[in-house]
């Protein structure tokens, strides 16, 4: 995909200009089967795209075989805050076994996207966020949100 050959839609450009004017980007999503909401995944693919969000610098630009190998260079969102908040539909113990892997959405976002764009990552996670949540659990979650917001 080359944005100079096939420019993104105006809506994507509008999101990008709003992000350029902001201090932080806050992404919130539910997590199903270790995947974020499809709409958010698609938004990330469109908006946080090279060369606006990051670009690559080749280690060996003149090499026929290794010219594509290099490292990311942060773009428009460099040194801003990227906040991810996800709700998991079950108790923490059911996701604990997967938490060591890089396949869970938060780690995938942090390592492959946010770090490429130079964002400082913050994370807010919830477990057992269901429609029939007890008031005590809801208040505990809201305390986490308040503490998190004050830390920014």
Residue ranges and their predicted role:
Residues 1-6, 136:
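N-terminal beta-loop-helix "entrance" segment that forms/cooperates
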Residues 3, 17, 34, 55-56, ...:
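Intrinsically disordered, low-complexity regions enriched in small/polar residues
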Residues 4-14, 145-152:
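Extended, charge-rich low-complexity interaction segments
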Residues 6-107:
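Helix-loop-strand module that forms the ligand-binding subsite of alpha/beta enzymes
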């Amino acid at each position: 995909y080359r944005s100079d050959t096939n420019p993104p839609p105006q809506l994507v450009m509008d999101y990008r200009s709003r992000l350029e004017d902001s201090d932080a980007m806050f992404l919130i999503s539910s997590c199903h089967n270790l995947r974020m909401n499809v709409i958010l995944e698609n938004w990330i693919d469109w908006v946080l795209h090279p060369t606006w969000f990051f670009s690559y610098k080749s280690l060996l630009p003149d090499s026929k075989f290794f010219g594509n190998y290099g490292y990311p260079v942060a773009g428009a969102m460099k040194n801003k805050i990227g906040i991810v908040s996800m709700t998991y539909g079950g108790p923490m113990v059911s996701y604990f076994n997967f938490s060591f892997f890089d396949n869970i959405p938060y780690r995938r976002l942090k390592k492959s996207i946010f770090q490429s764009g130079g964002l400082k990552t913050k994370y807010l996670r919830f477990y057992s966020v269901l429609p029939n949540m007890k008031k005590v659990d809801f208040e505990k979650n809201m305390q986490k949100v308040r503490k998190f917001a004050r830390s920014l």
